Amino acid sequence: MHNTIYVLGFRHQTTPASVREKLAFSPENILNTLPFLQAQCAGAEILLLSTCNRSEWYFASNTPPRLEEWLYQHTAISSEELKRHLFIYTDREAVQHLYRVACGLDSLILGEPQILGQLKAAYRLAKKAGSIGSWLERLFQHSFALAKHVRHQTDIGKNPVSVAYAGVQLTHQFFDDYSKRTAIIVGAGETAQLVARYLHDLKIKRLIIANRTLNRAQQLAESVGGYALSLPQLADHLHEADMIFGCARADVFLVTQNMAITALQRRQNTLQVYIDLGIPHNFDRNIDNKENAFLYDMDNLAQLIDKNRETRQKAAAEAETFIRLYSNDFLNWTQEKPQQHMIRHIRADAHNIRQKLLIMAYRQLAQGADPEKVLAEMSYKLTNKLLHQPCALIHAIPPDHKDWLAVVADTFNAELPK
């Protein structure tokens, strides 16, 4: 059966954070969602990539996926938002989009490596959910190989940057000497770890990690010489921080407007900067309306990040050449006849059988076995193993199916009994 590759989704270039946060899926949500969506889409192969900057559904299907209907029913997105922001790519356009994502060419920060890890995590979740078949398996393995190739053959990975780096960079507009400053990081995941590392390198005076799970906060805090808090303790310590980074996944604001007002009062209204890297938002956006409280979110960061793009444009152009080559290779594979897939599979199985028996023979020879006996035994086993499946198939053919028997006889140049 010939499938078509589809990509449907929402990304930072065309969808504001206020809409993207309605489409944020936790790993648990994804595991529960994929089998249900697969059943609704007539058994299509499906992978869901959900990050701060994008939610994208990848399909391999012989019919167009009915994702819009599912989104209406299972998310808070409105019909107007869906029509305005949903993108749909098919075949070559879809394949090249995935390859650009894997290489970091579609990221908020051009060439950032974090997305490849997120893509691999999404792949593992889809494998666990059982929603990946041979088409998406090949497509995503291809994308991983391409991303590795581009990293090694171009300068796309030089001077590494990330959303976390851009968030820390933004605080330079307000602070010079970090050895006199205190920072709070809300969350303990990958983005929080990057922020902590950057601040640690800047010789931050005091670093506080607040997380839902105290044990994870303690682990991160220990790695950077910081202090750990549980989330319920955050309000009591908020006034201590000059800068607060939101890096958690949460359904409610982790810092409300009232919490920020109280913190400002306790610190005699001295400057505080909030950097919200969370999707959904970690911080109440009304905080930005308060004097001496400045809030920046992912949409604000996009403006800063644009300045960093120029240094990677040349490498991106080189990467596009590899993307075209890899896309052609994958699309040529999709156009192969089913017989070619079958032949390749049969040959691969035969090669594996030969290789295993050859290794056994080498071991026997190394132990001093008689070479003639080893070769005779190997050839006997090889013959039996290669003929096992065809013989089992012949045994399974009903005697009255003369046409089937004739095809098999012709294939193996054998005579049918009269």
UniProtKB/Swiss-Prot annotation:
NADP(+) binds at residues 187-192. InterPro entries: 4pyrrol_synth_GluRdtase (IPR000343), 4pyrrol_synth_GluRdtase_dimer (IPR015896), 4pyrrol_synth_GluRdtase_N (IPR015895), GluRdtase_CS (IPR018214), GluRdtase_dimer_dom_sf (IPR036453), GluRdtase_N_sf (IPR036343), NAD(P)-bd_dom_sf (IPR036291), Shikm_DH/Glu-tRNA_Rdtase (IPR006151). PROSITE patterns: GLUTR. Keywords: NADP, Oxidoreductase, Porphyrin biosynthesis. One of its GO terms (biological process) is protoporphyrinogen IX biosynthetic process from glutamate. It is an enzyme of class 1 (oxidoreductase). The record marks 97 as: Important for activity. It catalyses: (S)-4-amino-5-oxopentanoate + tRNA(Glu) + NADP(+) = L-glutamyl-tRNA(Glu) + NADPH + H(+). SUPFAM superfamilies: Glutamyl tRNA-reductase catalytic, N-terminal domain, Glutamyl tRNA-reductase dimerization domain, NAD(P)-binding Rossmann-fold domains. Pathway: Porphyrin-containing compound metabolism; protoporphyrin-IX biosynthesis; 5-aminolevulinate from L-glutamyl-tRNA(Glu): step 1/2. It comes from the Bacteria. Catalyzes the NADPH-dependent reduction of glutamyl-tRNA(Glu) to glutamate 1-semialdehyde (GSA). Belongs to the glutamyl-tRNA reductase family. Possesses an unusual extended V-shaped dimeric structure with each monomer consisting of three distinct domains arranged along a curved 'spinal' alpha-helix. The N-terminal catalytic domain specifically recognizes the glutamate moiety of the substrate. The second domain is the NADPH-binding domain, and the third C-terminal domain is responsible for dimerization. This is Glutamyl-tRNA reductase. It comes from Dichelobacter nodosus (strain VCS1703A). The gene is hemA.
